[in-house]
């Protein structure tokens, strides 16, 4: 789609110390060949731990096409985005997920006459990353966007968003006041005191703005009515970072509407209101008509006076100028026509994309019927499955267990089952249910003796709790993982398992996709012959995969009979294992254990604290705040702290301010981590590192 913006055409380049190995080269070549030959749907069936992420990156490098990757949840999306940023540091890797930390949609329950107002909490950093994704898509071709199902929900029109974009160049003739009016029309706010994202400030002939998708501010210096200089600067310190010749500034909102659009929207909303009121009164729904009239009239007044109202997205059809029933504009419309779609964990993600529309529609239908919303609110919705398919081109489905839908579309799958480390799929042992607990206890003890770990999956919470108690009584270090355990506690338990503080985790359905634990050598599946969702072929394959990252990985299924799902899972695992053994023998490869660093956010905080206090006070007293006292280093000479303080004083006021700023940001970093805002914590860490580098240079210069 062209928006009169020339996209920078930089090549995709993967920077990795590794080369494609195992059957990665064959998978990359086959996928690329099929896509270049015009196949629309291709399935990559990649066993756990075979490097599907790296294969995808190398495929993008080979095809040189902008790519959208859809993940089933925010956690996996964040994980994949971080991996892609490491693999493609010079390309635009963006993150596009729902920006709500908390979201309670507007709803009405007729049975109890209960109206629930919309309530939400927006995460500013995720919102910035969403804006960064759309800005990148319109200005560059080397884009990879990692998204969740959020990408099929309504977004403003790309034409209007690009049309309101401002292009500024050194030497350009533009009146300063006209520029300020344009910023306001783009929904930026003037604030000469608190300079934050989405605001601008004016100081004589100098205008500074922080675009919503950037962390750096842009300074525009005028000489009369001509732009004399453009530069980027650090918004906190005011230090200039780079001089620019030209800059694009996109609107502060995806839902930006010019005066003509606003005028037209207000007119069509009034017309729809009149029609709907007549309809409701004809049906004898006087209460509903009165309610609708009152709510919509208030919204119209707000739109006229302020340009925005609560729930403005429900009028998106009027602002976009769409006909009733037509699909909304989404992130997909921001991509060039030749983009590639990758659906990760497709057995989960495909049904998820298909299910979004109906859930949204049933809630809105009730609101419309009872006079809380105009019928046009139904058109502020996610895409239906057929509409989604119309907007995407060639698609790669990634999964260890592809679903029936994608298997039916594709003409044979591309397999990737050889691991670069030579690791094999685990051996599977089926044992009788009688005496299963004592047998399991003996197996766990054997693993503990070898400093290995075990996962046990049961069918019910009750059984998981009872088994955990039984193992605890027998002296096993065990924890129980279930749906009530919050995210941070879950991460902590898995970390404790890897460190050996616990030897066994008992769970129900939480031991499947995306769990990467190289220390686990035993996965025990209790009641494997009870047919159902938790013991289906795909669930079993995903659970078996948790033991595939250890050289001596074994799976024990406790069952009295072999179900069809079990037989399929065992046959598939044996087939893969035979192929892996043959490959290893042919190439003389010995399976190597997967070495994966145990790291978490607490480590990151503690290390940063060590460095900060060593810099500011010449020593490090207590790492307790970060929860890792073992990372503390002894305080140096008692006079060292005074000496360091004197050095900072000698370097002058900027150095003192910098030291104070580092302390403040360190506190903010801890707060962000405590509130699970890990992206913000990591960003603050990077900022602290830059400031510390600057402070070191200042103190060195004054020695």
From Swiss-Prot:
A motif (Beta-hairpin) lies at residues 99-122. Gene3D superfamilies: P-loop containing nucleotide triphosphate hydrolases (3.40.50.300), UVR domain (4.10.860.10). SMART domains: DEXDc (SM00487), HELICc (SM00490). Pfam families: Helicase_C, ResIII, UVR, UvrB, UvrB_inter. It is found in: Cytoplasm. One of its GO terms (cellular component) is excinuclease repair complex. GO terms for biological process: nucleotide-excision repair; SOS response. CDD domains: DEXHc_UvrB (cd17916), SF2_C_UvrB (cd18790). Keywords: ATP-binding, Cytoplasm, DNA damage, DNA excision, DNA repair, Excision nuclease, Nucleotide-binding, SOS response. Coiled coil: none annotated. Its main location: cytoplasm. The keyword Repeat does not apply. Residues 33-419 form the Helicase ATP-binding domain. ATP binds at residues 46-53. Residues 436-589 form the Helicase C-terminal domain. The UvrABC repair system catalyzes the recognition and processing of DNA lesions. A damage recognition complex composed of 2 UvrA and 2 UvrB subunits scans DNA for abnormalities. Upon binding of the UvrA(2)B(2) complex to a putative damaged site, the DNA wraps around one UvrB monomer. DNA wrap is dependent on ATP binding by UvrB and probably causes local melting of the DNA helix, facilitating insertion of UvrB beta-hairpin between the DNA strands. Then UvrB probes one DNA strand for the presence of a lesion. Belongs to the UvrB family. The beta-hairpin motif is involved in DNA binding. This is UvrABC system protein B. It comes from Bifidobacterium longum (strain NCC 2705).
